């Protein structure tokens, strides 16, 4: 209907937020959370999404998302003369599921295949990770 989405309304400057990276198997749930609800209704409650506290962070993260960026809102900008907004956040902390972390040569590595992030391409199109490959960096 052209009105500002609740997400943008809730993300005032200085607010805390969590950016979750969903696993490809969560595509139905991600799509379900896009349903239009009255402002006082939460998509978390409407979809029975389990939440987990994270150390001393003021917000809870989604329990079964493999990656969560714990952020503070820097600014929100309206794009052109449209009702589209972009929100800039500062990532202050990162959660990665232990099942997606490996150690190699003394370095912590995130296993991209274990995360298998859901990519939203636009409209109703999504993608999975596809092929994962390694390229040596120049010296």
Predicted stretch roles:
Residues 1-139:
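Basic, polyanion-binding surface patches
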């Amino acid at each position: 209907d052209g009105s500002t989405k609740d997400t943008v309304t809730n993300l005032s400057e200085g607010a805390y937020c969590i950016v979750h990276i969903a696993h490809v198997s969560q595509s139905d749930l991600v799509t379900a959370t896009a349903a239009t609800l009255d402002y006082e209704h939460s998509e978390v409650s409407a979809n029975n999404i389990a939440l987990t506290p994270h150390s001393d962070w003021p917000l809870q993260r989604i329990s079964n998302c493999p990656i969560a960026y714990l952020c503070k809102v820097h600014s929100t900008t309206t794009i052109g003369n449209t009702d589209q907004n972009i929100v800039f956040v500062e990532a202050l902390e990162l959660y990665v599921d232990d099942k997606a972390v490996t150690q190699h040569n003394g370095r912590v590595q995130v296993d991209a295949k274990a995360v298998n992030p859901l990519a939203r391409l636009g409209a109703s199109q999504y993608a999975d990770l596809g092929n994962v490959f390694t390229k040596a960096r120049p010296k």
